[in-house]
């Protein structure tokens, strides 16, 4: 889980680099969708977001898309929800 060495996870790295997000939105899992979290930063680069998906189902959220410069960018990120 992400409680182990949180600084080494994707969310830990983003938190250390950018600080606490302005807003966090959580989507719980459903029968046809994995859980995911969006972190929004209103004051960085005119507003950026980071989308993390629990692709394994074990609470390990991975960064799959961001519109921030020099971060993972994948416009088709929603495929990871399946």
Residue spans for each PLM region:
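Residues within mature, well-folded domains
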Residues: 1-82
């Amino acid at each position: 889980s992400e409680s182990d060495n949180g600084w080494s996870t994707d969310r830990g790295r983003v938190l250390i680099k950018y600080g606490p997000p302005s807003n966090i939105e959580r989507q719980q899992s459903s029968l046809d969708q994995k859980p995911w979290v969006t972190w929004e930063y209103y004051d960085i680069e005119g507003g950026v977001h980071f989308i993390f998906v629990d692709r394994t189902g074990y609470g390990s959220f991975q960064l799959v898309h961001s519109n921030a410069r020099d971060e993972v960018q994948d416009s088709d990120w929603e495929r990871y929800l399946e």
